[in-house]
Regions:
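Long, charged/polar, soluble alpha-helical segments
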Residues: 315-411
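Short, well-ordered coil/turn segments that N-cap beta-strands
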Residues: 29-33, 68-70, 100-106, 139-144, ...
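N-terminal carbohydrate-binding accessory modules
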Residues: 21-71, 83, 187
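Short, acidic/polar
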Residues: 49-64, 125-134, 190-196, 218-221, ...
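Extracellular glycoside hydrolase catalytic/binding regions
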Residues: 138, 153-272, 276-296
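Bacterial N-terminal signal peptides
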Residues: 9-18
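Aromatic-lined substrate-binding rim segments of carbohydrate-active enzymes
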Residues: 57-115, 127, 165-183, 249-256
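Active-site groove signature of glycoside hydrolases
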Residues: 77, 111-117, 129-161, 195
Length: 411
């Protein structure tokens, strides 16, 4: 009897708490290792949901799990929901549960009816959409945070009048989510730290984006965000980082955020038909754009210090040997196709292993494509000439001390 009375008393006490006190707000998000997501096979967030493929989702989440990622930010468009609400609910539920099974929490990021933010009278129209989302996944253990609006102030600093109206809409939506879901915390994905601060009182979790082009600027934005988070006592995350076209390399920005102990979400996991030219880690088959990104996600970074060991690809005369054999093949009137391919492969491997050329179009890839095609001696000759020109400057003259083991080597 005493146990039952105690349980009833506890329940009454919980119900008496203000709604904000019931909200499941994390104290610290510095351990967040997240990613933005849509499938590589689709273009745009609406198409992702309209052509949703559970097997593809599970494949990609398995890639994320292998990288020890623990959060996913996925856009949830009104346009996909309104087309087929029943299918959308089913697919969203599958996504959240599939992520949760892999230890990955979900941050749904809202996309409302196009242009609706411009008309205040239309703002309440989103209530049915939001209520349906809450009813569908609001009690799922895999749901972590609602991102009620992405970059409402994109992309002006200070905000333009339109930006300010859009930011007001984001605040309105934060209140709506707070009303309809008294448990799950909300955030707004701000483009700039300054605008995150301006909207900070409307959210439970502070979120900013950081595509800054220098380490100093990355650090300054992080410091400003951390200072405001400390003042308010609210947890902080950066929900978008990493872009090869904005001088914001993944390994650089990841290193800065990790060293600052700020949780992050890369944009994005997959190399997609939308942003794939400048973002993304994985191709659908599990191959990657750049292994340095994978290493950085796991906390391993390039040595950019004074103690870098110089690569000496000709230490054992393999570069000299390759250049000699290449030139001999090139001088033949009727060279052998297979022999030339082998020479090209050896040259490509030397170039890649010592990083002697840009890696955006791998030398080994060029050889593989040539092997898979029809014999074309002229094309192979051109490729081998190019590789030989790269290798030739790295030949060591006879007697160069770099041919030898370093001083102090113990036999």
């Amino acid at each position: 009897m005493r146990t039952r009375r105690a349980a009833i008393a506890l329940l009454i006490a919980i119900l008496a708490l203000p709604v904000a006190a019931q909200r499941r707000v994390p104290k610290d998000l510095s351990g967040t290792r997240g990613f933005n997501y849509q499938s590589a096979e689709t273009i745009g967030h609406a198409e992702f949901w309209l052509q949703y493929n559970p097997a593809v989702t599970e494949r990609d989440l398995d890639y994320a799990k292998r990288l020890q990622l623990n959060q996913v930010r996925v856009f949830v468009p009104y346009a996909a929901w309104v087309r087929n609400k029943e299918a959308f609910r089913k697919n969203l539920l599958h996504f959240v549960r599939a992520a949760h099974e892999r230890g990955i929490g979900v941050m749904p990021t809202m996309q409302y009816k196009f242009g609706e933010w411009k008309d205040k009278k239309a703002w309440p129209n989103s209530r049915e959409f939001v209520a349906d989302l809450v009813a569908t996944i609001g009690k799922e253990p895999g749901l972590e945070i609602w991102d009620v609006e992405n970059e409402p102030e994109c992309c002006s600093l200070p905000p333009s009048p339109d930006n300010l109206l859009h930011m007001e809409h984001a605040r309105y939506m934060a209140r709506m989510f707070h009303e309809l879901d008294p448990v799950t915390p909300v955030t707004i994905g701000a483009t700039f730290v300054e605008n995150m601060i301006a909207m900070g009182d409307a959210v439970d979790v502070l979120s900013f984006h950081n595509y800054s082009p220098t380490r100093a600027q990355i650090r300054a934005n992080i410091a400003k965000a951390k200072q405001y988070a400390a003042q308010t006592g609210k947890p902080l995350i950066d929900t978008e980082i990493g872009c090869i076209a904005r001088a914001n390399p993944y390994d650089v920005t990841l290193q800065e955020h990790m060293q600052a102990h700020v949780g992050w979400y890369i944009w994005e996991l997959m190399i997609t038909g939308n942003w794939g030219t400048v973002h993304g880690v994985f191709y659908p088959d599990g191959t990657v754009r750049d292994p340095s990104i994978v290493a950085a996600l796991l906390g391993f970074f390039r040595n950019r210090g004074e103690n870098v060991v110089e690569s000496v690809p000709d230490r054992e005369n393999h570069v000299t040997d390759a250049v000699t054999k290449n030139r001999k093949w090139l001088a033949e009137a009727h060279p052998d196709w297979d022999t030339g391919l082998d020479l090209a492969e050896i040259s490509a491997n030397l170039i890649e292993a010592a990083q002697l050329a840009p890696m955006h179009n791998l030398p080994s890839r060029q050889v593989i494509l040539m092997r898979n095609g029809q014999p074309d001696i002229a094309a192979l000759r051109s490729l081998l000439e190019k590789f030989t020109a790269v290798l030739a400057p790295y030949r060591l003259p006879a007697g160069d001390p770099r041919h030898s083991r370093p001083p102090g080597f113990i036999q």
